[in-house]
From Swiss-Prot:
Transmembrane segments: none annotated. This is Large ribosomal subunit protein bL33. Keywords: Ribonucleoprotein, Ribosomal protein. NCBIfam families: PRK00504.1 (NF001764), PRK00595.1 (NF001860), rpmG_bact (TIGR01023). HAMAP family: Ribosomal_bL33 (MF_00294). The gene is rpmG.
Length: 55
């Protein structure tokens, strides 16, 4: 099965002492071997931040 469940976690929230926002999704392991980084909305910081794959 080429698709894998992933978790994207905010990289800026921990440095500021806020709760980390997380997004869940899937990725195709055959097309993207590295870790995914996306800009997603963080409701705790009220702005878009960089979210990195943690799983």
């Amino acid at each position: 099965m080429p698709r894998e469940q992933i978790i994207l976690e905010c990289t800026e929230a921990k440095a500021l002492g806020k709760p980390a926002s997380r997004y869940y999704g899937t990725k195709n392991k055959k097309q993207q071997q590295g870790k995914i980084e996306l800009r997603k909305y963080n409701p705790f910081l009220r702005r878009h931040t960089l979210h990195r794959e943690i799983k």
